[in-house]
Amino acid sequence: MPRASECLSVEDTLRVLDGRTIHAFHIEGCGGGHVPNVLKMAGVPNVIGSSTNPTLPFGRDAVAEHYGMIVSAHDLKVDLPGDAAMARDRIRAGTMGAEDVLHDLGVIGITSSDAQGMGRAGETVRRTFAMAGKMKAELGPLDGEGSYGTEASGDDNERVLRYMAKLTINPAIAHGFAHEVGSIEVGKLADIVLWWPQYFGAKPQLVLKAGFPAYGVTGDPNASTDRCEPLVLGPQFGAHGATAADISVAFVAEAAVRNGDQMPTRRRRVAVRGTRGIGPGNMLRNARTGTVDVHPGTGLVSLDGEPLVSAPTDSVSLSRLYFL
């Protein structure tokens, strides 16, 4: 998509797609794509939306932070009026807040990240669940049907599963390899992250890759037990030597598989499949569609005519206290 609507509008892009499936990577409140209304692509039946994490969750410093971030990421020159105006046009508190709500409603089904180009790749899990905490505080718990309930609902299972799907099975479905990864099922790779409950979303205890310990907490090698401090996160058996390639796969097009074994890697080749003809309706626990509108003057976002408003938060879950 044009990063600032310099070529096409949202409506132009949807006409070009003509109902074909697309994974739109920047359906979000501030990042790339059509300015100022890229969120209109959320909820469209053939558009699988995901958003990167710089504004997740919407915090008090997001508006101030993003001017410098956009200028740096896109190599803009703030002394040029056009560049400065383009950066300012992308910073909209109303759409930043609405992005959180669209995630909580299951309209945006995937969380993701750039790296060094507006996104913090190492924080996607933490920010996803910090957003879940912010939304519970604002909107209350979800009931067993994924709608808003009351405190009598008793647990956070529905919201946890909705947000977990944004990180795991839904990206796998969108990219065509849900038959290999994305959930814990017989026949799939045993790619599993294990957490102590008190550190869930912040610090993993062990990362299993195809069942092998590849990354995790290790104690002092001179210690008499495995819990003697200092405990540090680091690579384990599955990350060393040829093991990393042996327990990994290379996802390729079906045509590449049919063309024979020509890729110079020892990784097992797996063909992607099922990426055409899918849409938001195929996203687990995040399948809501509807008409999203962004007011061109105020930036107010609505879904099927209902305003979506979320205030910037002063504090978030899984923040600095976990990393002292």
What are these regions (language model features)?
Residues 92-109, 115-324:
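Active-site microenvironment of metallo-dependent hydrolases
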Residues 2-164, 199-200:
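Active-site neighborhoods of metal-dependent hydrolases
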